[in-house]
Curated annotation (Swiss-Prot):
This is ATP-dependent 6-phosphofructokinase. ADP binds at R21, A22, V23, V24, R25, R154, G185, A186, E187, R211, K213, R214, H215. The active site is at D127 (proton acceptor). ATP binds at G11, R72, C73, G102, D103, G104, S105. One of its GO terms (cellular component) is 6-phosphofructokinase complex.
Length: 319
């Protein structure tokens, strides 16, 4: 009988609990024991582990956040810290590890695998910034949260004939801004992958105003710069009445969508099956609605391809 360790690491994402549930229940179904590790790699080094059972994951599929909590851990980034982690895992007779998180979490799983400890990664991040998978757990829910906010902001924007800048998460990847902006009917979408000047944005505002449209929504990915700075510069160039909304951590919360719950469930079960097959240093993901797995190193080496077609479509539809 295998014993599986399970942790969530990095930024939380809606659907992580659904993945936790899937790992625990499928592992027990296959006759395994599961230890939940609280607060990620930090909790592992502090031996904050709890054996999980079926009731541990009851009534959590609909909950946002992660019942295992999450944190970041500088000590784990050191060789000494990782050796300590392996020693603790062996102390609890844990045979393998499932890590739910993003690229940093996967890098940690790779390091453990390099030390001979089997680990599998499940993609959980709202940014959707992992190139090897079409979607990450939490992305769909975060998009829906943003779209809901854009709709409400548009109501007041149109009432007062204002330009509203909505800042969303996405340091290096503009997927949240792009797809939420497209689905929310934003007049301008600003992402890290496409260079656009303040003058160009101001010209778009002036053009729409000349057509008689007195309000606009600009969706800005945080990785491009701050919404407040953009507001000041646009005010100078366009003279428009502007307001800023920074959605912040509200994007990470909320009950996961159907898509995220199903994705998390499928990935969780597949991760357990890989471990039972003796696989290690791999991540699971989804491509064209099929569950895939590949080496962590290969997954992290892939470069995210920006959806230029969707971006151009958004420009066409925002005239």
């Amino acid at each position: 009988m295998k014993t599986i360790g399970l942790l969530t690491s990095g930024g939380d994402a809606p659907g992580m609990n659904a993945a936790i549930r899937a790992v625990v229940r499928s592992a027990i179904y296959y006759g395994c024991k599961v230890y939940g590790i609280n607060r990620g790699y930090k909790g592992l080094l502090e031996e904050d582990l709890t054996e999980m059972n079926l009731s541990s994951v009851g009534d959590i599929i609909h909950r946002g956040g992660t019942i295992l909590k999450s944190s970041r851990c500088e000590e784990f980034k050191t060789e000494e810290g990782r050796l300590k982690a392996v020693k603790i895992l062996k102390k609890y007779k844990i045979d393998c590890l499932v890590v739910i998180g993003g690229d940093g979490s996967f890098a940690g799983a790779q390091k453990l695998s390099d030390l001979g400890f089997p680990a599998i990664g499940i993609p959980g991040t709202i940014d959707n910034d992992l190139a090897y998978t079409d979607y990450t757990i939490g992305f769909d829910t975060a998009m829906n949260t943003i779209i809901d906010a854009i709709g409400k902001i548009r109501d007041t924007s149109s009432s007062h004939e204002r330009v509203n800048i909505v800042e969303v998460m996405g340091r290096h990847c503009g997927d949240l801004a792009l797809y939420a902006g497209l689905a929310g009917g934003a007049e301008t979408i600003i992402v890290p992958e496409v260079e656009i000047t303040v003058d160009e944005v101001a010209l778009r505002l002036k053009t729409t105003q000349k057509r008689g449209k007195r309000h606009s929504i600009i969706v800005l990915a945080e990785g491009v710069g701050s919404a407040s700075d953009l507001e000041k510069e646009l005010k100078k160039e366009s003279g428009a009445d502007l307001r800023v909304t920074v959605l912040g951590h509200v994007q990470r919360g909320g009950s996961p969508t159907v898509s995220d719950r199903i994705l998390a469930s499928r990935l969780g079960v597949r991760a357990v099956e890989l471990l039972l097959d003796g696989k290690s240093a791999r991540v699971v993901g989804i491509k064209e609605n099929k569950i895939i797995d590949l080496e962590i190193s290969e997954a992290l080496a892939q470069k995210k391809v920006f959806d230029k077609e969707a971006y151009e479509m958004a420009k066409i539809l925002s005239i």
